[in-house]
Amino acid sequence: MKQLSDVKFSTLDLVPVRENGSPAQSLRNSLDLAQHVEKFGYTRFWVAEHHNMDGIASSATSVLLGYLAGGTSTIRVGSGGVMLPNHAPLVIAEQFGTLESLYPGRIDLGLGRAPGSDQMTARALRRERSGSADDFPEDVAELVRFLGPRTPDQRVIAMPGTGTNVPIWLLGSSLFSAQLAGERGLPYAFASHFAPRFMHEAIRVYRNHFKPSAVLDKPYVMLGVPLVAADTDEQADYLATSVYQRILALMRGQSLVQRPPVKTMDGLWLPHEREAVGDFLGLAMVGSPQKIRAKLEVLVEQTQADELIFTCDLYEHADRVHSYELLAQVMKG
């Protein structure tokens, strides 16, 4: 049985844009956060692809990863993830092959099958391409081929990319990706940071369908976890109101720019909205280090996850850095 100290811990950054802030500052904050969590002992620093969202500045994922990798030295950097229906597999192979060539042994390629946007934005991204989520298994296989060794009959190659064998992860919030990751023998990251409802079933499906591969001899599970750590439970509860406001805005179709914390959410949400936000953040770790340690120990005991990746979208950058620092102390015991 795994203990908390056996589990790797990583960072997922959505590169949040705050109220009256700028994307430029958000991108600089992302690098600063990566540099800090590298010192704190985190395994990876991933960024997520989202489009047409005014509160998230990580749309050009591979470009941002080059910036992050260039400003750090040891931490792995990667996509959490690239939404493959938006892209031709060859282009992704070339982009991540370039990153791997520049920063060998430090690049991860996490793949999702959702567009990471609304239908109108998805059409704007793809233009005349006919790609869709239905093509995902075939696109993953094509990407694996482009990043693997060149075969004698291969007429189209990724350069850079061929032979780099960039580690590929499958990401998802449904059972489809869990089964596919298992059948392909790939590591699996479940999006429990926003869809915890199917977490246990997805882990079961992945492990039951797992077939050893050239990259993995046994299943490897990563779970997404929302984080708000502070010195006291009261301070964490206060800081978390920025997160609640952001999720509430998402559900209402409103601006996603980060808003400052408030003393109370009363009057900001209706009872059914409070319940919906609570479901969305069902796995959230909010509190002091002592409180978070107890909750994480239960999570690891129940899931036997190999790695946890934490997302922390607080209004003040310094509060985010401190939250990750406190978590590192918890994870290291």
Task: Please describe what each predicted stretch is.
Residues A178-R197, A202-I203:
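A conserved active-site cap/scaffold subdomain adjacent to cofactor or substrate pockets
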Residues F9, V37, G41, E49, ...:
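Conserved, mostly hydrophobic/aromatic
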